[in-house]
Swiss-Prot record:
Its EC number is 3.4.11.1, 3.4.11.10. It is an enzyme of class 3 (hydrolase). This is Probable cytosol aminopeptidase. The gene is pepA. Presumably involved in the processing and regular turnover of intracellular proteins. Catalyzes the removal of unsubstituted N-terminal amino acids from various peptides. GO terms for molecular function: manganese ion binding; metalloaminopeptidase activity. The keyword Transport does not apply. It comes from the Bacteria. Mn(2+) 2 binds at residues 288, 293, 311, 372. It is found in: Cytoplasm.
């Protein structure tokens, strides 16, 4: 029976088998991991790459056949190399080898996830795959089957919603995955991986959807549909409700657009699933949902402005994370607060020098309308803290300074020292590679305003990410452990695909946040 996933992104079906099929499946591709041969293995009769994890699924004859093909292709076994071979002794159409580099006694889950992603991107028109990747020995605690499924699904992801027949792919993409595995929990792990990958793909879909089709009202509608399908309680505040309740940041940022802002609340009451509901933790999630960011009156340069379709990636990840928590029935309470607005220049847009009253009463002088994300996040943080959470995790494409400091693949993590470090460590474990950043107390002095409680930017050129983090810290309630994940670069890949990461939306940091929820559910 296939492993099924809940409603949402419709990816391939996932199956687990204890052996290769006996009958001919010539339409399928067998993905086999290989490693570089050790010095003692290399000879005229041995290739530079050798098959890993052969037993019990591949016979000695099949291994010899594959390695002969690798030798003919002069494969070296270097990381991320792929080769397509024909192995007549096997009941498959072809064999795709993916190299993991030097041999190891234990493999990190993300190394295997990445190899699976590389293989998936090399499948061509193949719709059915079988793989022995799950038989690689993982590090202690690593969920290898889950990593394999995640890598294959995320690597094969593609977004074609707006392509006509003229440019749409002629094939259906990857439709079926069979993981060869003998582990007792292989089916459970594979199901977990499929559900996680589907959530990440949902986040990617939202980010890749152009702002012509995903504006605040439509984004809120999508969030409501996804939330209700997962069994979440959903509350949507429109512009009139936001104005009445005093969400000055969201209203101020959104007032320049004809498309009015929204704020969505998604609630997972998982504590009732806990063994001891009274001791179950409560987590608040907040994600920035700027559906398009021109910069407003402080307008951005035109050259790369089209990438600002991704300025709602934090919101997409938060929505995907909480629906995933509901689908996998995490025994903790999770509440997501998601502000949504479009930042446009117009005769009604906020001006540099305007003063906003944020939700909760703090006044902010808007010195730069392109520092708008922190304004809507501030409203959402105050509202989220009214629920008295134990932890607050928020994420956004907060600052271009994140890419200056850490590049396009490493999120910056700021917040309460211990919790920040916990989030960063978890991010590194799942392969999203967050890095802890400091928030020096003196940064608050740079946010002084001559007319309001705070200014939304400092007069300094430097430490822009940290200054934004210091601004957000002013809105976090005392006693709440919190972390902000700045994904300005990692949320959207403008370079070539790599690993299981496509060009365009990446889904970062969905897996980090969900892994944190799992960790909190298990360890408090």
């Amino acid at each position: 029976m296939p492993v099924t996933t809940d409603p949402g992104y419709q990816g391939p079906s996932v199956h687990v088998a204890a052996s290769l099929p006996k009958h001919d499946v010539s339409s399928s591709v067998l993905i086999v991991p290989v490693v570089s041969a050790s010095d003692s293995d290399e000879s005229e009769d041995r290739p530079g790459a050798v098959v890993a994890a052969a037993e019990p699924f591949l016979t000695a004859a099949a291994v010899a056949e594959i390695e002969a093909g690798l030798r003919a292709l002069e494969a070296t076994g270097g990381s991320d190399q792929v080769h397509r071979l024909v192995a007549p002794s096997l009941p498959v159409g072809s064999v795709l080898t993916v190299s993991l580099g030097k041999p190891r006694s234990e493999w990190p889950a993300d190394t295997i996830r990445r190899a699976a992603g590389v293989a998936a991107r090399s499948l061509g028109r193949a719709e059915v795959v079988i793989t022995t990747l799950a038989e690689l020995p993982g590090e202690s605690g690593a969920s290898i089957c889950s990593a394999v499924v995640e890598g294959l699904m995320l690597g094969s992801y593609r977004f074609t919603d707006f392509r006509s027949r003229k440019t749409a792919p002629k094939d259906n993409g990857l439709r079926k995955i069979t993981v060869l595995a003998n582990a007792k929990d292989a089916k459970k792990q594979s199901a977990h991986g499929a559900t996680v990958a589907s959530a990440v793909a949902t986040a990617r879909d939202l980010v890749n959807t152009p702002p012509s089709h995903l504006f605040p009202a439509e984004f809120a509608k999508c969030a409501k549909t996804l939330g209700e399908s997962a069994g979440l309680e959903v509350e949507v505040l429109d512009d009139k409700a936001l104005q009445k309740a005093g969400y000055g940041g969201v209203i101020g940022v959104g007032q320049g657009s004809s498309r009015t802002p929204r704020l969505v609340r998604l609630i997972h009451q998982g504590s009732r699933l806990a063994k001891n509901p009274k001791n179950a933790r409560k987590v608040a999630l907040v994600g920035k949902g700027i559906t398009f960011d021109t910069g407003g009156i402080s307008i951005k340069p035109a050259a790369s402005m089209h990438h600002m379709t991704s300025d709602m990636a934090g919101a997409a990840a938060v929505i995907a994370t909480i629906t995933l928590a509901a689908q996998l029935k995490l025994p903790i309470d999770v509440v997501a607060t998601v502000p949504m607005a479009e930042n446009m220049p117009s005769g009604t847009a906020q001006r540099p020098g305007d003063v906003l009253t944020q939700y909760g009463g703090i006044t902010v002088e808007v010195l730069n309308t392109d520092a708008e994300g922190r304004l809507i996040l501030a409203d959402a943080i105050v509202r989220a803290c009214q629920d008295n959470p134990d932890y607050l995790i928020e994420t956004s494409t907060l600052t271009g300074a994140q890419t200056v400091a850490l590049g396009s693949r490493i999120p910056g993590v700021m917040g309460s020292d211990k919790f920040r470090d916990r989030v960063a460590k978890t991010s590194q474990q799942v392969g999203e590679n967050g890095w802890p950043m400091p928030l020096p107390d003196e940064l608050k002095d740079d946010l002084k305003s001559t007319v309001a409680d705070l200014a939304n930017v400092s007069g300094q050129r430097f430490a822009g990410m940290l200054v934004a983090g210091a601004f957000l810290r002013e809105f976090v309630a005392d006693g709440v452990d919190w972390a902000h994940i700045d994904i300005a670069g990692p949320a959207y890949n403008t370079d070539s695909p790599w690993g299981y990461t496509p060009k365009g939306a990446t889904g970062v940091p969905t897996r980090t946040m969900f892994a944190m929820l799992e960790d909190i559910a298990n360890h408090g």
